[in-house]
UniProtKB/Swiss-Prot annotation:
HAMAP family: Methyltr_PrmA. S-adenosyl-L-methionine binds at T152, G173, D195, N234. Its main location: cytoplasm. One of its GO terms (cellular component) is cytosol. The keyword Lyase does not apply. It catalyses: L-lysyl-[protein] + 3 S-adenosyl-L-methionine = N(6),N(6),N(6)-trimethyl-L-lysyl-[protein] + 3 S-adenosyl-L-homocysteine + 3 H(+). NCBIfam families: prmA. It comes from Burkholderia orbicola (strain MC0-3). Methylates ribosomal protein L11. The gene is prmA. One of its GO terms (molecular function) is protein-lysine N-methyltransferase activity. This is Ribosomal protein L11 methyltransferase. Keywords: Cytoplasm, Methyltransferase, S-adenosyl-L-methionine, Transferase.
Length: 300
């Protein structure tokens, strides 16, 4: 069977309703994406702390629907638009999707990723290219963080250079658990991973088990009291600013903090908020993203 992809870009207030209508009318699957992804106008993921709670799509949204060949895209979209009360049918693009081995195709798109001096992130269907490398086995999944995004890479490079055996590490916004797992493999103990998404927490636990890395995961209300030698947070600039006091308070005096999910143009603003608590600056930039790193002052 052949398939078609119907791609529609429209305003935030209609994206979720159109998605539901397309599914009701027979679409096989529908996803909503940020139409400005990987540009300076990219918006934070929804559900992050400090964001508008009822915001369910991006300001400039892209709806992508997978249709079987027996559905006419224009007719289906017109019906969906009418169902949700749009005055006119949005502009759209149709892409032909060839029938193929989707599992094999997906796997072929994810190769082992070298990071830093000795780290390899390796999907389960591959062998590590270097038997002496520090290997993290991680498959692409629902939780963010496979090492391919610049912010994940930056944090991993920083951890590789910064973690000393026996140091305590807090990974706040742990996603897939990739940073917490790396910290553990670098000798940190204990390592704590926190995320607001229960699905991410479960994914991180599974990834840690697969990598034989003992990490404790939980939701924010389960974050332990006390301070850590190292705190790392790869989130986004808005929640990072909102949580500055809390995150800084988790760092021991003289301990270190690394922040990413920050675009280069946002670096000064984020650094200014954290400067109240830590001596912080841009550690490294990659593809328009930065990692900020700093040390908590002995007293403040």
């Amino acid at each position: 069977m052949s398939y078609r992809e119907l791609v529609v870009e429209l305003a935030r207030e209609h994206a979720e309703a159109l998605s539901d209508a397309l599914l009701d009318l027979g679409a096989l699957s529908v996803s909503v994406e940020d139409a400005d992804a990987d540009t300076p106008d990219e918006q934070p993921l929804f559900g992050e702390p400090g964001l508008v709670p009822d915001r369910t799509a991006w300001q400039h949204s892209r709806v992508v629907a997978l249709l079987s060949a027996d559905h006419e895209p224009a007719v289906l979209l017109a019906a969906a638009a009418n169902e949700i009360g749009l005055a006119e049918t949005p502009k759209f693009v149709v892409r032909e999707v060839e029938e193929q081995d989707w599992v094999r195709l997906t796997q072929s798109q994810f190769e082992p990723i070298p990071i830093g001096e000795r780290i390899w992130v390796v999907p389960s269907w591959h062998d590590a290219p270097d038997p002496d490398a520090l290997v993290l086995e991680l498959d692409p999944g629902l939780a963010f963080g496979t090492g391919s995004h610049p912010t994940t890479r930056l944090c991993m490079e920083w951890l590789e250079q910064s973690v000393k055996p026996g140091q305590s590490v807090l990974d706040y916004g742990c996603g897939s658990g990739i940073l917490a797992i790396l910290a553990k493999k670098c000798g940190a103990n204990p390592v704590i991973g926190i995320d607001i998404d229960p699905q991410a927490v479960e994914s991180a636990r599974q990834n840690s088990e697969r990598n034989r890395a003992e990490v404790t995961y939980g939701l924010p209300d389960a974050c332990p009291e006390g301070e850590f030698d190292i705190v790392v947070a790869n989130i986004l600039s808005n929640p990072l600013k909102l949580m500055a006091s809390m995150l800084a308070s988790k760092v021991k005096p003289g301990g270190r903090i690394a922040l990413s999910g920050v675009l280069a143009r946002q670096a000064d603003e984020v650094a200014a908020v954290y400067a109240r608590y830590v001596d912080i600056s841009v550690w490294r930039e990659h593809e328009g993203w930065v990692c900020l790193a700093g040390t908590r002052r002995e007293s403040h």
